[in-house]
Every structure is written in C-alpha cells, then in structure tokens.
C-alpha cells in the first residue's frame, strides 16, 4: 500500500507547478472499516469555563463533517481530545481498528519553533520508510509541487512565513496516507490559490474529514454534515452548510 501511494508521487508524474497553485492530494493506504469514531459524553472545562458539555456523536464512513459555531476554543479542544493531545474531564472516544489519522492543529508552532532543520530534512521526518521516498529528488519534487523550489528547500523551517508553514503541514499529512483527516482551520494564512488547492484536495479525498473553517465557501463545498458547537453543547445537522444557513435564517424570522 505504501508503494501504491508513492507510485502516485513519482517525480515524472508530479504536476508541474505554475508557482501559483500548490498540488494538494490525499491518498489512503487502506479503506475505512464500518467503525470510524464514537464519542460518548465528553466534557471539558478550560480556565474555569465548560467548553464541552456531555458531547456525543458517531462518525460514519464517507462523512465530511464541518464543526461550526462561534466558540473556537470548543472546537480546538474537541479536536485535541480525539487526537489524544488532551484528556477529557469526563466521557470517552474510540477510533475504529482500521482507522489511521492525520492531524492539522490550529497551532503548529511546536513543529517549527526551535527547529534547526531545513525544509528537505524537516520533511524527511515524515517520509515513509521505503527507499524511493528517501531520495533527495523525491523530497525536492514533493516540495516543488507545494511551491518550494530551487534553494527554497534549504531554508531553515523556523524562518518560514505562516502560509509556508501551513503548506509544510499539509505536505506532512499527504505523506501519511491516512484514511481520516482532522483539520483545525487549515485555510488560515493561505492565499486564494492555496485555499482552492486544499479545497479540491479535500473534496476529492475518499476517506473521512473532520474540520473547522471560517471560510463559508470552503465549508459548503466540502462538508456533507454539519455539527454545531454552542455553549458546550453539540447539535448534529445532517445536511449541508446551505441547509444549516437556511434553517438559521428561518429560525431568525
């Protein structure tokens, strides 16, 4: 499966970058089974405020779920808990046995601050452990399609701009071949071309996506299920973002 993933990433086949649109494409090494994720009664208090209050939901095969609502901390806290970075005060979550995850955190500073690696060596940390992926030409070609070309690839990662760091984090996710992607505001710091590329990559992805974003069009084009987090409570809207906006408008009337 690793080999099949890498066949798609061979240097010859990599789309020639126009220096405007990065190429973002996620492939799965294995299909999701029936059990994806079950969340039961999650509660969490942060700095004296209950940001999650008895939150329960199940994720199904084919779901692309946008978590929406004004409370950014609630969404980030939920993602951190299901990714094992934070303990809940109460409740449980369980990933299915076939599931492999890749996580795009809201704050990526831990990956770059105090890191003395250049881009090629940084990417090498996440490259599959098979010979063809560990060649300089593979890594340079991979970075090239994410708009890092020439001597750019030897820049220390700690001096990269916000948008460049986001492209690095997306590159890392693409190399993992996971069947579930969890993304906390992946469009922050990106220009329109990069947002379009991420959008297309997530629309085409055959696995499961859990994400948050302030970009309404991004949510509308990707999500087939909306979950609203308000005052610590979760409401599952089993429709598109357009349906959700329409129902909000009706409620306001």
Q: What are these language model-derived features?
A:
Residues 21-253:
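ABC ATP-binding cassette signature C-motif
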Residues 1-5:
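Loop segments that connect adjacent transmembrane helices in multi-pass transporters
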Residues 6-16, 245-253:
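C-terminal boundary and immediately downstream tail of ABC-type ATPase nucleotide-binding domains
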């Amino acid at each position: 499966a690793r080999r099949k993933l890498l066949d798609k990433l061979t240097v010859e086949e990599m789309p020639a970058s126009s220096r405007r649109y990065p190429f973002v494409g996620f492939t799965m090494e294995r299909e999701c089974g029936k059990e994806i994720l079950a969340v039961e009664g999650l509660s969490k208090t942060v700095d004296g405020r209950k940001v999650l209050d008895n939150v329960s939901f199940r994720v199904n095969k084919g779901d692309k779920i946008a978590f929406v609502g004004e409370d950014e901390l609630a969404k980030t806290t939920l993602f951190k808990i299901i990714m094992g970075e934070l303990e809940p005060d109460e409740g449980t979550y369980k990933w299915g046995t076939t599931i492999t995850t890749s996580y795009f955190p809201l704050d990526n500073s831990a990956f770059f601050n105090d890191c003395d690696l250049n881009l090629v060596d940084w990417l090498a940390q996440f490259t599959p452990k098979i010979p063809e992926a560990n060649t300089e030409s593979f890594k340079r070609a991979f970075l090239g399609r994410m708009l890092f070309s020439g001597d750019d690839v030897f820049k220390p990662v700690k001096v990269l701009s916000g948008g460049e760091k986001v492209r690095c984090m997306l590159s890392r996710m693409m190399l993992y071949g996971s069947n579930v992607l969890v993304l906390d505001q992946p469009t922050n710091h990106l220009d329109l071309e990069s947002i379009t590329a991420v959008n297309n990559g997530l629309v085409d992805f055959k696995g499961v996506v859990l994400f948050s974003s302030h970009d309404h069009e991004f949510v509308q084009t990707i999500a087939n299920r909306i979950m609203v987090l308000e005052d610590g409570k979760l409401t599952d809207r089993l429709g598109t973002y357009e349906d959700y906006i329409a129902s909000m408008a009706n409620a306001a009337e």
